[in-house]
Amino acid sequence: MANQRKPILPLLLEKKPVELVKPSKHTHCETLSLSTLDNDPFNEVMYATIYVFKANGKNLDDPVSLLRKALSELLVHYYPLSGKLMRSESNGKLQLVYLGEGVPFEVATSTLDLSSLNYIENLDDQVALRLVPEIEIDYESNVCYHPLALQVTKFACGGFTIGTALTHAVCDGYGVAQIIHALTELAAGKTEPSVKSVWQRERLVGKIDNKPGKVPGSHIDGFLATSAYLPTTDVVTETINIRAGDIKRLKDSMMKECEYLKESFTTYEVLSSYIWKLRSRALKLNPDGITVLGVAVGIRHVLDPPLPKGYYGNAYIDVYVELTVRELEESSISNIANRVKKAKKTAYEKGYIEEELKNTERLMRDDSMFEGVSDGLFFLTDWRNIGWFGSMDFGWNEPVNLRPLTQRESTVHVGMILKPSKSDPSMEGGVKVIMKLPRDAMVEFKREMATMKKLYFGDTN
């Protein structure tokens, strides 16, 4: 059920010099402001994502040439991405300065076949990052940096990967998917993207007032659960494959536990509750401490009027579920899932989004953030829908795999739910969950996973 990431073979690449790809048509220079959510300090981090394409013997086109040309055309519609990010001298906020510099584009080759790497499914993160372009960022200075870079890596089998580095400050996961979908549409021969890009960052700017900011988690600082395994730099990554049948059986058993419930549970509500509980056990969090599940809730359709379809900036709000470790342990999965469902609904309450935007502005003004022990904090993000915006077939069929990575130090506080690799037909309709934990805690996590699987699914295979 779980596969530990490891470099199956040495990944040696021959790289060509980086080039800057500019818009294919002239676009005017300007400086663009970002939204309150874009400016959240936690969003100034690079997304690294790898899209894996199998060889297509019938296609004699060069994917590098197609993607280079498509990128140049894309930047006419998404011209801010060919600018640079910097902080305003007047208020210290991020802004995109567009002078037409272009986007870093890198080409690499490998003598390996993608199949020998299991289509990068089990590669160690640090090895897989070689398939993604490097963007050097000094977050403490005001040095400009590119918000986007691409790397195309060709393999001996004829397959290739597209590696993207894209700053979270400019777009969220939905926005990343929208941009890459537009890129592959243009590479397939379309004259323009099917979805028109929209900036409109002013729609999500909070009003500034004189109230003090409320630091998330400050009300439980000193009460948060701790783990003997943390802190540590010895962190490992696991891919947990959960089949469609197992998810259905888990949902069915939970619905039997609470027949009074009028709404069914979503896959996210079920899996987040299940994994949160197992993670708490694996880390051996102290029973009286508080553990927190963070949930990102999309708000594109919540605003009045809703954000346009082509909006690619950050558009989500975090909500939280808080329990003591003992409460989490003693609660049924259905009870926890019901709490997750209720927490998600708070993001839709009138005034909640406006207040969250105001509070984010206050925290940035005061330069305040949570600095307490965060062993018991866990975010589980859902990439199943935002990772695939639409068809990406531009001559090599759909990607056989998608792999998000982190370019900062490995964090044990974030997990991801994704669609499974298409290289394994038995996983159709299922999910894969990526988890990072201290090495010893991961052993416990796998043991707990096997026990829970036997309880809910009736087997340990």
Curated annotation (Swiss-Prot):
Pfam families xref list: Transferase
UniProt catalytic activity: 2 (E)-4-coumaroyl-CoA + spermidine = N(1),N(8)-bis(coumaroyl)-spermidine + 2 CoA + 2 H(+)
UniProt-recorded Gene Ontology molecular function terms: spermidine:coumaroyl CoA N-acyltransferase activity
EC number, UniProt record: 2.3.1.249
Pathway per the UniProt entry: Amine and polyamine metabolism; spermidine metabolism
Alphabetical GO biological process terms: polyamine biosynthetic process; spermidine metabolic process
Tissue localization of expression: Mainly expressed in roots at low levels, specifically, in the root tip.
Biophysicochemical property: pH dependence: Optimum pH is 9 using spermidine and coumaroyl-CoA as substrates.
This protein's UniProt keywords: Acyltransferase, Polyamine biosynthesis, Transferase
Keyword Transferase tagged: yes
Acyltransferase as UniProt keyword: yes
InterPro entries: CAT-like_dom_sf, Plant_acyltransferase
Active site positions, chain numbering: H168, D393
Summary of subunit composition and partner proteins: Monomer.
Function, as annotated: Spermidine coumaroyl-CoA acyltransferase that mediates the conversion of spermidine into dicoumaroyl-spermidine.
Family statement drawn from the similarity comment of this UniProt entry: Belongs to the plant acyltransferase family.
PANTHER family: ACYL TRANSFERASE 4, SPERMIDINE COUMAROYL-COA ACYLTRANSFERASE
The protein's name in its UniProt record: Spermidine coumaroyl-CoA acyltransferase
